[in-house]
């Protein structure tokens, strides 16, 4: 990247970005671990794109993202480790082609290096989660069932392995019979 990126440290709260265009960095936005009962960041009508690392890296904090695009990251477009998150009307799309891509559109975990990070909530409403891979969601759930891992997808288009449960409602799974790659057709 040509510069680092935006970082919100542990003691930083009530940050609000509207109409931001963040691109060309080593990462996009990084939010350090903090209390999940207080809002760390609200991101609205913004773009995070073409970064060499993670686009939006959130660790055990509370963040709301609306009407935004996070795309083309060398690692993950969005990386969630524990916390409380809501994404509404967002596009997470990883078609990164400037180097070897090491991630997916969405990574969700509740444990790292044997340390628990409860995922109290990760809600995705009316979102597109896509990319050039066959599975653009990577989940890392702890073997310890007592560590919260709560997610919900509603009215989304998802490029991932189809899954059915009560946490996935009215989702369209990206398949050959649902969509056509226009680059291959004239």
Language model features: what each stretch is:
Residues 1-186:
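Beta-strand/loop edge motif enriched in small/polar residues
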């Amino acid at each position: 990247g040509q510069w680092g990126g935006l970082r919100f440290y542990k003691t930083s709260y009530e940050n609000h970005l509207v109409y931001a265009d963040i691109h060309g960095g080593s990462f996009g936005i990084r939010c350090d671990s903090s209390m999940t009962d207080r809002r760390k960041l609200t991101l609205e009508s913004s773009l995070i794109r073409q970064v060499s690392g993670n686009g939006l890296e959130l660790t055990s904090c509370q963040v709301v993202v609306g009407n935004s695009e996070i795309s083309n990251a060398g690692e993950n477009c969005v990386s969630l480790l524990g916390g409380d998150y809501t994404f509404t009307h967002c596009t997470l799309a990883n078609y990164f082609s400037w180097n070897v891509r090491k991630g997916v559109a969405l990574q969700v975990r509740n444990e790292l290096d044997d340390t628990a990070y409860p995922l109290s909530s990760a809600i995705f409403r009316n979102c597109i989660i896509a990319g050039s891979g066959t599975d653009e969601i990577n989940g890392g759930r702890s073997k310890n069932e007592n560590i919260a891992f709560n997610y919900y997808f509603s009215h989304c288009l998802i490029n991932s392995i189809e899954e059915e449960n009560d946490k996935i409602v009215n989702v369209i799974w990206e398949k050959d019979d649902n969509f056509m790659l226009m680059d291959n057709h004239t």
